[in-house]
Amino acid sequence: MDSWDQCPSDFSVAEFYGGDLEGVRQKLDYLQNLGVEVIYFNPLFVSPSNHKYDIQDYDYIDPHYGKIVEDGGGLLKDGVSDNRKAERYINRVTNKKNLEASNRFFAELVEEIHARGMKVILDGVFNHCGSFNKWLDREEIYQVSGDYEDGAFVSKDSPYRNFFGFQDQFAWPYNTTYEGWWGHDTLPKLNYEGSEKLYDDIMRVAAKWVSPPYNADGWRLDVAADLGHSPEMNHKFWRDFRKSVKTANPDAIILAEHYGDPKEWLQKGDQWDTVMNYDAFMEPLTWFLTGMEKHSDEAKPQLKGSVKDFEDSMRHYMASFQTSQLLCAMNELSNHDHSRFMTRTNEKVGRAATLGTAAAEEGIKPAVFREAVVVQMTWPGAPTIYYGDEAGLCGFTDPDNRRTYPWGKEDIVLIDFHRDIIRIHKEHEALRTGSLMFLKGDDNLLCYARFNRREQFVVLVNNKEQERDVELEVWQCGIPKKAVLERVIISNETGYSLMPKQYEVADGVLKIK
């Protein structure tokens, strides 16, 4: 791309802005100063796309993100789609010097991140790979390089033939009848039932990246419930995956992308540790504060401000978690699959393709976004910030939500707000591991407490523009019947403040005017 500020187009998988792991390294001071404790990377392994959910080689960091030490070769000419002629790309991603240098750089980066007291989570895409993958080699780039065995697309005698499910066993060479995830031929589904070698190789990969010298601190698992062709295989795979990972690194976390009830994978503690928390965080909070669906594809005004619906949803979906699983669940407001929360505050239904990218920034309500962040930082779970949210970045659902970070155009006040609320979250044990109690629910007014034996927090979220009087029976959460509470932060239409203010509790009741 010529312009850093240009928004991604609808078919932008081959558009690159030049970001890499060296750029992350240069911004570690910023992340550390913000209060970040864990960096979750979207896929980093070799892949032809910018999103990299179509992995080409599980054993190597993409040199475009890592290190290109040997370059050269011609570029594809305009109008040419034969990737066998993409000489420069082939050299970059198949040359072992580039691949090994990229792995070394990643190991060094993780070491530096660890030295700063932060951790690293990798994105694991094990349900499917990409059509460029060396095991399939539909684009024949590994065939061209001459240093690799034949891919399953190329030859029926490929050692990887059973890594994929082919419908036509007589269509070689160049067999296009392999199974694709959701029918996408660019995303070949991996056939674990058909290949013990594939199964074992992925178990090796799972352990490799959480072991020295790479020492990642865990995996986020893409479309984890889709893996395999039966529930039995799915659960067996994740049990074995857990054994491989935890044997290599007992402290590594395993969290899954999952929509719906995760109980099958969580209840015995033998598969996933936790999940990306859509049902028990992102969705109920989005409906309550904005009345919007998480892709901005639908509006339900009746849910906006409905504390009853919010509380009912939270109670129902949180019941699927054990406490330890809930406390480390990934609580996001935005991510790479959904519209950014700031854009949802404008309550516009649609996508960039129909409304235009500028519409994502029109009519946004930063005050509502700050409300969401307050809940995120005071709710049970691991608050997870999608890059740029803290700087005011907008965007409809993907790919528009994958805009570049707005360097030089950040909302500095919003960054300061995040830094302060993150600090508050980290300084108080009650906000991280304390009990949760709903105190009061009214039209657009949500009140709850987080508390333990040593400290108690009362959180009030008024989703109306008008100020209102509130009376709460706070004795229920362990606050003495006669006490003085101190305000730690307030956010409103004009901004936020850390100015302390005291409130008296009389007969166990807190009154706020």
Q: Which residues fall in each region the model found?
A:
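Generic structural signal for well-ordered alpha-helices
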Residues: 28, 106-110, 206-207, 235-242, ...
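Extended substrate-binding grooves/exosites of carbohydrate-active enzymes
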Residues: 13-20, 147-148, 155-160, 174-184, ...
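Loop/turn elements at helix/coil->beta-strand transitions in domains of secreted/extracellular proteins
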Residues: 32-39, 114-121, 215-219, 249-253, ...
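Substrate-binding/active-site clefts of carbohydrate-active enzymes
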Residues: 1-37, 44-213, 241, 247, ...
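Conserved alpha/beta catalytic core and glycan-binding cleft of carbohydrate-active enzymes
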Residues: 132, 238, 242-243, 251-399, ...
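Conserved, mostly hydrophobic/aromatic
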Residues: 31, 41, 58, 113, ...
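Short, solvent-exposed turn/loop segments enriched in Gly/Ser/Thr/Pro and often Arg
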Residues: 40-51, 123-133, 222-228, 257-262, ...
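Carbohydrate-interacting/catalytic domains
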Residues: 1, 9-10, 17-37, 46, ...
